[in-house]
Amino acid sequence: MPDAVTTTPRRRRRSRLVSVLAAILVLVLALLLSYALWTVYENTLTTAALDQGPLITATTSGASALSTTAARALKAYGGEAVWKDAVTVESTVTVGGLLFQLKGVNIPAHAKITVDVQRPHTVIDPVDEAGDTGVLDGFSVTILSRSGAILEQRADARDHLQNASVSTHWDRLNLVYFLGYAFWGYYSLPHQLLRTDIAWTELGDGLLQADFGPNLAVHSRIQRFWFDRKTGLLRRNDYTPVAASRDTKAAHVIFEHGISNGIPYPSKRRVKMSLGQYGWVLPFPDFITIDVERWQLH
């Protein structure tokens, strides 16, 4: 009987030890799996991973004197002559991600999005399953019926999104404003390098910082852009969305480019969160996914 009493605590200790070792093993395997996923996560995102050189003395330039990085990027996307005279970009896209699940609203798959390259003006068709159309014009948004009748309108759309919680639900006008200004910024980026009302600062080879000022509908006034040092193509864009709290740090990662009439365009975009401002990017979740199925510059 004493032997049985003595054996039971020993078994319990062994059982606890086995449980602890199993937990450690699971943790190690999880870390190894995370590391494996991280290594195949091609666009992850430190200065070294983006193949950037060391920071240099910051230089600010206007359209008349493009920095080395800006000139390389503009050339990569078709050149100054193409974008100086560009009028519109037409596209077909599918948008998804955790953000729109939290907001409770999204546009249908394969929606047509058209932006005016020269100014913040975007048309989203359709904006919902009813077939209505959403229009962004500066800071105002409108929803039109199929016949063109005005269904809803909001002149101060940015104020309705300013520093909201990520879980705050949106109405259709919120959605149109967010996607409208976002896609205008994404599609017109090469032309933005030529604008005199945007202050571009080269922080390092392949790294630009933009000050958009207070009068343009964009994610945030200050943004950073990482471009490939060899190809000049965009790889990452960091900002704090106007639709999120001030401590939100978004990293917009370009995974793939397509080609339309000889002009490259980002075709697979993923918006993720970064660990601190301009830091490492969390591989998941995807807050926003953008798959561009068709893209045409006019």
Identify what each model region corresponds to:
Residues 9-33:
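N-terminal Sec-pathway targeting helices
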Residues 29-48:
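Membrane-interface motif at the C-terminal end of an N-terminal transmembrane signal
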Residues 61-68, 145-216, 244-245:
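Flexible, processing/modification-adjacent segments and terminal tails
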Residues 130-142, 146-171, 217, 278-297:
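Catalytic loop of the DD-peptidase/beta-lactamase superfamily, centered on the K-T-G motif
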Residues 204-298:
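Gly/Pro-enriched, hydrophobic low-complexity segments
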